[in-house]
């Protein structure tokens, strides 16, 4: 499986000056946990990290120190995540048929989750890891913040990554979005807008996206528990 990891990760909400993916988490940079888990998935055979030029040296060194069993390639990203993913798709080897896309900030995804998503692509043309919503969701008027209605949660799932699909179709979807100035927050949404079915793959409750300092504390606690159970990360 070919894997793209968007890793721009500006740390404004973390209170960090640089890339939040280079912040320490349980003794190693946050991105190192993401890479290690991805490389441990048996089907992973190629990883492309998409980032900004100012982070290239640090990320290259990080990947080198990990000594991963799969090749890791650097891809210069664009101004937005969507542009960066498109650049990543264009940089894939010509033999790539399916691709997974995983946010670098989701550093707790397990190798098993990568494998489930890769296996699903043998059957479905587009997939997204997701978990059922547990909270009650309120739709709110934006100006007054008054509740408009409560949305039944039985059919609601919280999207995660990995997401992925057929390389040709994803390239076409991103090219279409660029031409039409369509902006989305994840790759599955592009497939949806193009009328393509997207299959949900059961995600993981621990697969949180590190966005705030509180997320970092939660991730630290989860990792400590996991490392006690299995000391080899």
From Swiss-Prot:
It comes from the Bacteria. Pathway: Isoprenoid biosynthesis; isopentenyl diphosphate biosynthesis via DXP pathway; isopentenyl diphosphate from 1-deoxy-D-xylulose 5-phosphate: step 2/6. It catalyses: 2-C-methyl-D-erythritol 4-phosphate + CTP + H(+) = 4-CDP-2-C-methyl-D-erythritol + diphosphate. SUPFAM superfamilies: Nucleotide-diphospho-sugar transferases (SSF53448). GO terms for biological process: isopentenyl diphosphate biosynthetic process, methylerythritol 4-phosphate pathway. Its EC number is 2.7.7.60. GO terms for molecular function: 2-C-methyl-D-erythritol 4-phosphate cytidylyltransferase activity. The keyword Cell membrane does not apply. The record marks 153, 209 as: Positions MEP for the nucleophilic attack. NCBIfam families: ispD. Belongs to the IspD/TarI cytidylyltransferase family. IspD subfamily. Catalyzes the formation of 4-diphosphocytidyl-2-C-methyl-D-erythritol from CTP and 2-C-methyl-D-erythritol 4-phosphate (MEP). This is 2-C-methyl-D-erythritol 4-phosphate cytidylyltransferase. The lineage of its organism: Bacteria, Bacillati, Cyanobacteriota, Cyanophyceae, Gloeobacterales.
């Amino acid at each position: 499986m070919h894997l793209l990891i968007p890793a721009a990760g500006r740390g404004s909400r973390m209170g960090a000056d640089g890339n939040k993916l280079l912040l320490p988490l349980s003794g190693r940079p946050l991105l190192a946990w993401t890479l290690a888990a991805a490389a441990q998935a048996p089907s992973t055979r190629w990883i492309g990290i998409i980032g900004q030029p100012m982070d290239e040296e640090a990320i290259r060194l990080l990947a080198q120190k990990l000594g991963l069993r799969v090749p890791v390639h650097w891809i210069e990203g664009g101004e937005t995540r969507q542009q960066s993913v498109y650049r990543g798709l264009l940089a894939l080897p010509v033999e790539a048929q399916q691709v997974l896309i995983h946010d670098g900030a989701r550093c707790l995804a397990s190798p098993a989750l990568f494998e489930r998503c890769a296996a699903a692509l043998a059957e479905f043309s587009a997939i997204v890891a997701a978990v059922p919503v547990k909270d009650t969701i309120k739709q709110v008027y934006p100006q007054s913040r008054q509740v408009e209605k409560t949305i039944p949660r039985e059919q609601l799932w919280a999207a995660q990554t990995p997401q992925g699909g057929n390389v040709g179709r994803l390239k076409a979807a991103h090219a279409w979005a660029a031409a039409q100035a369509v902006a989305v927050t994840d790759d599955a949404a592009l497939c949806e807008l193009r009328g393509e079915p997207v299959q949900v793959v059961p995600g993981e409750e621990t697969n949180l996206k590190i966005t705030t300092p509180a997320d970092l504390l939660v991730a630290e606690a989860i990792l400590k528990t996991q490392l006690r159970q299995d000391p080899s990360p």
